[in-house]
UniProtKB/Swiss-Prot annotation:
Record-linked SUPFAM superfamilies: YhbC-like, C-terminal domain, YhbC-like, N-terminal domain
Entry's Gene Ontology BP terms: ribosomal small subunit assembly; translation
Cellular localization per UniProt: Cytoplasm
Gene (UniProt): rimP
Primary location group: cytoplasm
Function: Required for maturation of 30S ribosomal subunits.
Annotated protein name in UniProt: Ribosome maturation factor RimP
Comp. bias intervals (Polar residues): 10-19, 247-256
Species of the source: Beijerinckia indica subsp. indica (strain ATCC 9039 / DSM 1715 / NCIMB 8712)
Length: 314
């Protein structure tokens, strides 16, 4: 990225050597939002970077009223529910103060999923050989939408512009059309992977490898935590009487609950939703909100003070 904030030609980024962790975290996107989504993206990007995550996309839809969807991931493409929750807790106060969305909305933090959008050069490198749908802004030879297999990024293409051009082997080409095309990334409007059986198999293999790696880490933790138990002794005659603690609530006595939760590999969708409904005004007390939530889940219920009392016998 140069001093003007523009993406450098891919010759300096693609096909040379892997990006450093800091460079991968701050790798610029090829696409930018517009309108309110752009304002949310400007606020969300630094918050995500502080958490070691990077922004994929911001989308605002009218689903369930108004939904603000923020896709995020780690530089390696992984994500987990805990990270989504951390983003929601860190980003919600910022959105409340800056107030980019005027009406009530639902905040949804999620990973990109299997059929993910491709928004960075590294996304195209990682998806090399996969099938993709591409939509251009102005089009190429009178055509805006293409579908085909992802090839390498051409840095020296005359139509590539400052971001290069994507070599695509078309699967939707007619007999009289060329199957090999170069799509300028400067004109890119949207690129999304096609959900195929091969893509699903790769995601399942990645999830299996992540689980096996997590099981190995848990076994090492179990071996480290296994220590000879001290001999049991009676409480004694004058020992204070207390309730026996449930070992399930003590992480030290229950190594299973102390295990680290596995990461969700790249391509597996995970999300965390947080609703922000009602008119803007003073915040409700937590216990009132929790009572309202319980009533909405279990139906209307009466407390002991609301139950009708029987008349006293005469």
């Amino acid at each position: 990225m140069d001093l003007d904030g523009k993406v450098q030609p891919p010759s300096a980024q693609v096909g040379q050597q892997p990006l450093s962790p800091d460079a991968a975290l701050h790798e610029p996107r090829l696409l930018q939002e517009s309108g309110i989504a752009a304002r949310v993206a400007v606020l969300a990007a630094p918050v995500l970077a502080d958490l070691g995550l990077r922004l994929v996309r911001v989308k605002i839809s009218g689903q369930n009223g108004t939904t603000v969807q923020i896709m995020a991931e780690r530089p390696d493409g992984t994500m987990d529910v805990e990270a989504c929750e951390s983003v929601s807790e860190a980003l919600s106060p910022v959105l409340d103060v800056e107030d980019p969305v005027k009406q009530a909305y639902h905040l949804e933090i999620s990973s990109p999923g299997i059929d993910r959008p491709l928004v960075r050069l590294s996304d195209f490198e990682r998806a090399l050989g996969q099938e993709v749908r591409v939509e251009l802004k102005t089009g190429l030879a009178g055509r805006k939408r293409f579908r085909g297999t992802i090839g390498p990024i051409e840095a020296s293409s005359p139509i590539g512009g400052s971001k290069g051009a994507l070599r695509l082997t078309r699967t939707d080409a007619k007999p009289e059309e060329e199957t090999e095309v170069l799509l300028p990334l400067d004109d890119l409007h949207e690129a999304r992977l096609v959900l195929t059986e091969d893509l699903i198999r790769q995601a399942l293999r990645a999830a299996k490898a992540a689980r096996e790696g997590d099981d190995g880490n848990n076994e090492e933790q179990d071996e480290e935590q296994e220590e000879p138990a001290p001999p049991r002794r009676g409480p004694g005659r004058f020992a204070p009487r207390h309730k026996t603690q449930n070992p399930e609530h003590n992480p030290a006595q229950n190594p299973i609950s102390a295990r680290a939760k596995p990461l969700v590999p790249a391509g597996v969708r995970t999300e965390f939703k947080k609703s922000k409904t009602g008119e803007r005004g003073p915040a409700q007390k937590p216990h009132l909100a929790s009572q309202a939530a319980r009533k909405s889940d279990t139906g209307s219920s009466r407390s002991g003070h609301d139950m009708p009392r029987k008349p006293a016998p005469k």
